């Protein structure tokens, strides 16, 4: 196989895309990073970069036609997926495929596939396109419930409603966190689950492979900590892998899928799936013999996927900083790195207005509990320069 002539265009150039571009660069693959703002993290390591509105069909199609990439790899949801469907019909390679990208960009599409077509176990749910519909569906779902915008990313607009006086506030929060013109929400019965996992699932030319389950803690719908492996029963793991294979087979294409699942005893509930590397999977940068970004690349270009191994119990902690500056300066890294079991990735984001994920702490230890505690200790050292 000659991969030197491959050209990859990344749509969305955040921190996950940066690690993917680095993986491609290491194999001599030409890379193009695209986003709506200049100097995005992945642009800092790509051969070429372009700033466009990826929701603008004309701008997106013109750039793709001009650059003629071998593979088009979406990193975010805020892309004109109708254009990707059109381009795929003209023999462009969309990763994993245009169908998967379009279906997973909104919760209504993917929940319909999972619950109605595949009959996967999910929480009780309903959709609402107006505030009155929202109030109506609450009557059948009951308290407590989770509300999420139909279209959003990184936990924006999500909240758990436990009391009646939180209902109006949660609707407004969902509207403010919704992406684009979509105003619909999904209302889900709150499952009092034991834990939640991400099961990184790799579809490739030789079949489907799984990484060890990743446990994680979320706050306000966004990842804060993750660890691998997460201990679970053989029964729950087998069910999780079965669900992950079923949903990813239905979506199709090659690449890494981040399948989010709720576990209660040996019961497994499908939550969401992303057709790309997952933020909780950043722990694989330290935990696995082949990290999720390298796996995504290998699956896309047709390179072998050997046995995926967890080398040691590991954890990650999102470096979430708060400030208001166009030139962020981060300090405390020297103190955090004094521990030989700690590594750090700083994403290269300069602007911060409010809270923003600026990097990740990676740790390894003899067990995940110690790795997680070590990540929290390292995280405590890191802050913006005052």
Curated annotation (Swiss-Prot):
ATP binds at residues 107, 148, 153-158, 188-191, 196. Residues 112-301 form the ATP-grasp domain. It holds the Pfam family PurT_C. SUPFAM superfamilies: Glutathione synthetase ATP-binding domain-like, PreATP-grasp domain, Rudiment single hybrid motif. GO terms for cellular component: cytosol. GO terms for biological process: 'de novo' IMP biosynthetic process. Mg(2+) binds at residues 260, 272. InterPro entries: ATP-grasp, ATP-grasp_carboxylate-amine, ATP_grasp_subdomain_1, PreATP-grasp_dom_sf, PurT, PurT/PurK_preATP-grasp, PurT_C, Rudment_hybrid_motif. The keyword Repeat does not apply. Gene3D superfamilies: 3.40.50.20, ATP-grasp fold, A domain, ATP-grasp fold, B domain. Keywords: ATP-binding, Ligase, Magnesium, Metal-binding, Nucleotide-binding, Purine biosynthesis. It comes from the Bacteria. This is Formate-dependent phosphoribosylglycinamide formyltransferase. GO terms for molecular function: ATP binding; magnesium ion binding; phosphoribosylglycinamide formyltransferase 2 activity; phosphoribosylglycinamide formyltransferase activity. N(1)-(5-phospho-beta-D-ribosyl)glycinamide binds at residues 15-16, 75, 279, 349, 356-357. Involved in the de novo purine biosynthesis. Catalyzes the transfer of formate to 5-phospho-ribosyl-glycinamide (GAR), producing 5-phospho-ribosyl-N-formylglycinamide (FGAR). Formate is provided by PurU via hydrolysis of 10-formyl-tetrahydrofolate. Homodimer. Belongs to the PurK/PurT family. It comes from Francisella tularensis subsp. novicida (strain U112). HAMAP family: PurT. Pathway: Purine metabolism; IMP biosynthesis via de novo pathway; N(2)-formyl-N(1)-(5-phospho-D-ribosyl)glycinamide from N(1)-(5-phospho-D-ribosyl)glycinamide (formate route): step 1/1.
């Amino acid at each position: 196989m000659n991969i030197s002539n491959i050209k990859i265009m990344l749509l969305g150039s955040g921190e996950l895309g940066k690690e993917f571009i680095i993986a491609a660069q290491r194999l001599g693959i030409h890379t193009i990073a695209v986003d709506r703002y200049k100097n995005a993290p992945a642009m800092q390591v790509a051969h070429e970069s372009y700033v466009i509105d990826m929701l603008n069909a004309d701008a997106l199609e013109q750039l793709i036609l001009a650059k003629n990439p071998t593979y088009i790899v979406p990193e975010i949801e805020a892309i004109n997926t109708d254009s990707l469907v059109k381009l795929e019909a003209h023999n462009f390679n969309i990763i994993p495929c245009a169908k998967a990208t379009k279906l997973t960009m909104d919760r209504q599409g993917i929940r319909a596939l999972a619950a109605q077509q595949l009959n996967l176990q999910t929480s009780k749910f309903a959709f609402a396109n107006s505030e009155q519909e929202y109030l109506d569906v609450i009557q059948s779902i009951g308290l407590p419930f989770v509300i999420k915008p139909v279209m959003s990313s990184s936990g924006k607009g999500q909240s758990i409603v436990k009391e009646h006086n939180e209902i109006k506030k949660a609707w407004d929060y969902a509207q403010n966190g919704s992406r684009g013109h979509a105003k619909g929400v999904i209302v889900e019965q709150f499952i009092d689950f034991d834990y939640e996992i991400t099961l990184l699932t790799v579809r490739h030319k030789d079949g489907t492979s799984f990484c060890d389950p990743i446990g994680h803690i979320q706050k306000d719908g966004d990842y804060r900590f993750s660890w691998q492996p997460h201990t679970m029963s053989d029964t729950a793991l087998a069910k999780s892998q079965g669900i992950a294979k079923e949903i990813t087979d239905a979506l199709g294409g090659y690449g890494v899928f981040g399948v989010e699942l709720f576990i209660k005893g040996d019961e497994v509930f499908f939550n969401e799936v992303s057709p790309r590397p997952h933020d909780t999977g950043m722990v694989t940068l330290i935990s696995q013999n082949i990290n999720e970004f390298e796996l995504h690349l290998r699956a896309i270009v047709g390179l072998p996927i050997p046995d995926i191994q967890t080398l040691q119990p590991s954890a990650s902690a999102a470096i979430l900083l708060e400030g208001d500056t166009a030139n962020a300066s981060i300090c405390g890294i020297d103190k955090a790195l004094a521990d030989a079991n700690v590594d750090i990735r700083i994403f290269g984001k300069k602007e911060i207005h409010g809270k923003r994920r600026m990097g990740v702490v990676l740790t390894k230890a003899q067990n995940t509990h110690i790795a997680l505690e070590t990540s929290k200790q390292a995280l405590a050292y890191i802050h913006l320069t005052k």
